Amino acid sequence: MATEIPPAVRNDLDRLRQLEDQLQAVLLRKQQYEGELRNVDKALNELNKLPQDSKVYKVVGTFLLSTTRDEAIQDLNQRKELLDLHLQSLVKQENMLRKQISELENKVKQVLAAGQGGQVQ
């Protein structure tokens, strides 16, 4: 006779799947921000090589606008700060989710190993 998974364990497994989905979403956003941060760093590196009185262009929507080198550097530094803050937040979320996943996995393993199936005795 097949053993049925108790409702409490089923709920824990559902919660585990939700946490893993959330972790994947956080990791994807983190990866996107890291890519954007690399692009910002490359742009800053190139701008810093230019003479101070250089004119540069930036894309705003569907327009290409002229700006000064210093304004472009300032804009990119602000964007970099914002990306760093987002990344710090995502790292905290990632760590929290990993901890919750680990705790829930251990709980489910203990219940299943004990053969109690989550039932109260």
Curated annotation (Swiss-Prot):
The keyword Chaperone applies. It is found in: Cytoplasm. Gene3D superfamilies: 1.10.287.370. Keywords: Chaperone, Cytoplasm. GO terms for cellular component: cytoplasm; prefoldin complex. GO terms for molecular function: protein folding chaperone; unfolded protein binding. Molecular chaperone capable of stabilizing a range of proteins. Seems to fulfill an ATP-independent, HSP70-like function in archaeal de novo protein folding. Heterohexamer of two alpha and four beta subunits. Belongs to the prefoldin subunit beta family. PANTHER family: PREFOLDIN SUBUNIT 1, PREFOLDIN SUBUNIT 1-RELATED. NCBIfam families: gimC_beta. This is Prefoldin subunit beta.
